[in-house]
């Protein structure tokens, strides 16, 4: 019979049928290799895991068949004396039986059992270590997720896996300062072990390491929802060729720049995951809450232009060093968007490229208001789904997947994961074999890097050589070494649909002009900010059908109906409905056709919509009134636009099913905030009140407003031309200036509109 031991819910097993029957839930099973440290490990397990029983069996007192009947949830192999082949009891057989079925953890001899079972050899470590504390570094993956570097661990061993026999299915996970291997992990199965003792009081982060093991629920990394990044194999290879005493310095000298970046990104990812609020679970929660901004179709956005420009934000690179360290990602991205870039590529790798996730975030925010905005690409060394979640949450529409860095299995997993978040990846290749892999993957956007990532040498013929392999429905992009219109023309002639330009744009004294040159665009095709055409006319305070007809017949563009209770200009609801019917069945006298302009800002685009409306636009004016009241008037009168003339919250704008004009004082910092109001209305404020007061705005100061805006306050038929000349508004708004004795004067309305339209 099993007996209870004083370690939480653990039981010491005797493998009898009764013992098996006693376990109602699936247990975590510890195989005890006759070592006193076994119970320290068990204590950690029982303190960390309260949901399932923990059963301990000596390695020669239970068979694997009997163990299988227990249907264990997880398997732990304890430390122990001797050699795993001679003294490990059922450990090796148990590993073989349960590999890929349940998570397995090996400690000290337990690791040696894993090593030997997978085809490696265990031999003398060259020294006897007993209670020695060493510093180790690790890869930040698997059970090391969220654990910092350079931690202290306690070692008790005289044997170790012979690294020259390291099985291909295992990866080195941790090592001492002088290169002695301290951990290994199976590449596919959720099997991992350490040579040191995480349960020792002198070992740092032992509980965290064991907790990561306990968090697993399945026998493979993939089933646990973990895409294990391709490891940097330079360390493994060097250790096979040398003894355990090979130094990490010697190993690093054999690494290519790509391998160095790869290794550093593994460390960066691990450090990010352990920050409060940035764990994998946290990021998944944010995605589930739909916190990520909307995503556009990367493939379709590229198809809109040929050639499509993928303009890059890049401060530095390993091959060129510093390029433009003071570059502001937001300004750079907006500049690219305004000249018609289809994609903004943002380097986020911090050490060699001097980028950051913040660059990605601000680049997206900067172009969010641009009409038909460019897609945002996170360009980085993507090796972990965590990076893809980061990208989506920070506004990316696509991520870069480099075939040279990933195994076929990992490439497929990351590709599918990106697609599951709505992002079509850009798959990068450098040779025919990689191109074949990308095509078989089903990639819709394939980029050829003319730069070999191992040597960083550029061969501009690489793209040309691979172009003929690409199916017709796949977008082919040239990703490097492009610095002139001639390069763009050359690739376009060979079927390349998109070009990525980074360094040349970053170094250009006038990036906008250089981008226009690359795309062969004239300056007239580029959005250049504020409108300089004849302003639209809005007559506010209209409260009769006759006045509305006069406005339309005279060429007015917008009719303002005031629904503010205390206003002397409040319109009767029945009259408002009559005016609405008339307005929506009458064509405007002056209609401005939409222009084919690249990279329009939010406000320019909204102005174009106003100017091109086929009928006059009906504007309902409200001031500090309930949201539901405004909604009811919108529905009853069929308003085209809502004008908020009070202190209404910005968030209301997205709750109203109509475009919104919002009033601001001249000194407001919110005037040019995009994605909310379609145009700001600038009015004079007297005693905190605005609208219909007959007070003028400072026209000279208004001329510096950087976006299309509505000018109101003190305008009359006599001064409106001067006001327009000085302040350059997109729309002029009049109410008291076309009244006589408090009533709308039809002749003044005609005179005001004519004065504007004859400019």
From Swiss-Prot:
Recorded name of the encoding gene: trp1
Native source species: Schizosaccharomyces pombe (strain 972 / ATCC 24843)
Positions of the UniProt region annotated as Indole-3-glycerol phosphate synthase: 257-519
GO process annotations (BP): L-tryptophan biosynthetic process
Keyword Lyase among UniProt keywords: yes
One Pfam family from the record: IGPS
Pathway(s) the chain acts in: Amino-acid biosynthesis; L-tryptophan biosynthesis; L-tryptophan from chorismate: step 1/5; Amino-acid biosynthesis; L-tryptophan biosynthesis; L-tryptophan from chorismate: step 3/5; Amino-acid biosynthesis; L-tryptophan biosynthesis; L-tryptophan from chorismate: step 4/5
GO cellular component: anthranilate synthase complex; cytosol
Name this protein carries in UniProt: Multifunctional tryptophan biosynthesis protein
